[in-house]
Amino acid sequence: MKKKTWFLNFSLFFLQIFTSSNALDVTQFGAVGDGVTDDSQAFLKAWEAVCSGTGDGQFVVPAGMTFMLQPLKFQGSCKSTPVFVQMLGKLVAPSKGNWKGDKDQWILFTDIEGLVIEGDGEINGQGSSWWEHKGSRPTALKFRSCNNLRLSGLTHLDSPMAHIHISECNYVTISSLRINAPESSPNTDGIDVGASSNVVIQDCIIATGDDCIAINSGTSNIHISGIDCGPGHGISIGSLGKDGETATVENVCVQNCNFRGTMNGARIKTWQGGSGYARMITFNGITLDNVENPIIIDQFYNGGDSDNAKDRKSSAVEVSKVVFSNFIGTSKSEYGVDFRCSERVPCTEIFLRDMKIETASSGSGQVAQGQCLNVRGASTIAVPGLECLELSTDMFSSAQLLEQTCMSAQSVQPRTTTQPMQDPIWVFQSRGKQLRVYNIAILVSFISLVTYILAR
């Protein structure tokens, strides 16, 4: 009998070696999940346990529960690589009156290699109490220095300011998100990207009070596709060059996106007095539905009022090598194309091809007009008022540029494979310990071994 007991204990030990994982549920660390109790410390304890473990770490936010969190910082670097966050429940921020701590952001992940956040959970920033506030307002979810980052499947609601901010990250994939805030909510950008490279954003539905996506300085190799944007301010490059900033943006490809009732469609915006460049940018395959400014380059951006930008300086961010291709749909205003560039630093190599933008109000298929200032380039179509672009049927340069830009952006691939951890097929729990089995072959082998021992 003692021999059988020893064999059973050995078998359990053997199974644990081959099937154990660092998968930790926040409720194991005291999280209540009633939407009222502050669960911040429980989340930090769970994170510390996952981050300091070995192997693949999994941080689980269970379904059917709502966790109220004060501002939190999830710090790397972690021994566990990759780190999986399985977001199945709901996170809610405190109201402005109950806010404690950092007002720059609500949730921050920093210095983490191979972070994967997936699930059908919800992140609610409770931003309505902040939107009338004139001072600083927190971004809901921020990632800083997180390389090989994946974010997928979540719903993001009502951030006090921007919903998601990506900074100093390399190799990022964001997909299948739903981001929603009222059209009247100020500065509630969907996704902001700055000082980052090799970023893919795809198949997201975004409705906000500001830019659906904003690409800021220090970015390169950005591929955006399958975005449904509206309401909002469109997909923007910038703003760039504020307060004399030297800005750099290059190799950006925006493809197959829809804009519905937005203030802008495809936009590049820079401040006077800045320097640097925005170049190798392509917007291709864009559908427009009653968009105020379908295509706009604005080198006189002034925080929203370009017409009154009186401080016109001798320097500006250089905008060049930009292709707008395959646009179809309607403009809310009479202008489908609006280019306003600096006399000292004009926009160059700007190409329009294969587009049909009509005014929504006319109802008669009237072609939307264009206006331009200090722009050099070419167009395959005659847009009324857009005489600054040379009319040409030979657009080999623009076709080359479009292909080169989108191929560079599409070549973005993570350096390491970070596949999400599967749900366990069998869970054994005893005396507060939990054993999870993920492989059916190992489970069958274990059952056969135990059966053999007991039969002897």
UniProtKB/Swiss-Prot annotation:
UniProt GO BP: carbohydrate metabolic process; cell wall organization
Localization in the cell: Secreted, Cell wall
Any single GO CC term annotated in Swiss-Prot or TrEMBL for this entry: plant-type cell wall
UniProt PbH1 repeat ranges: 169-195, 196-217, 219-239, 249-270, 278-299, 314-341
Enzyme Commission (EC) number: 3.2.1.15
Entry superkingdom: Eukaryota
Entries under SUPFAM superfamilies matching the protein: Pectin lyase-like
UniProt cross-references to SMART domains, sorted A to Z: PbH1
Active-site residues, record numbering mapped to chain: 210, 233
Pfam family, one: Glyco_hydro_28
GO molecular function, one term: polygalacturonase activity
N-terminal signal peptide: 1-23
InterPro entries to which the protein is assigned, alphabetical: Glyco_hydro_28 (IPR000743), PbH1 (IPR006626), Pectin_lyas_fold (IPR012334), Pectin_lyase_fold/virulence (IPR011050)
Primary localization class, coarse: secreted
Protein name: Probable polygalacturonase At3g15720
Organism (species): Arabidopsis thaliana
